[in-house]
Amino acid sequence: MSDNDKTVTITQVRSVIGCTQKQKATIQALGLGRPNYSVVKPDNACTRGQIRVVQHLVKIEEN
């Protein structure tokens, strides 16, 4: 399996109420918006950087 085939499933587990604008914008950029929403994204440096910003709000599953 090459690096291009790897994906991560990102599930929002906490609300963005009380979060900074940067964290709210990152959640929107990931395609999330409400708790228990999930998206599948490619596993690359860009996605990992976005996950790091909101790591306390999301759950990650590597595929």
Curated annotation (Swiss-Prot):
Domain of life, per lineage: Bacteria
One GO-annotated biological process of the protein: translation
Keywords: Ribonucleoprotein, Ribosomal protein
GO molecular function, one term: structural constituent of ribosome
GO cellular component terms, A-Z: cytosolic large ribosomal subunit
Classification via InterPro entries: Ribo_uL30_ferredoxin-like_sf, Ribosomal_uL30_bac-type, Ribosomal_uL30_ferredoxin-like
SUBUNIT field: Part of the 50S ribosomal subunit.
Family statement drawn from the similarity comment of this UniProt entry: Belongs to the universal ribosomal protein uL30 family.
PANTHER family: LARGE RIBOSOMAL SUBUNIT PROTEIN UL30M, MITOCHONDRIAL RIBOSOMAL PROTEIN L30
Protein name: Large ribosomal subunit protein uL30
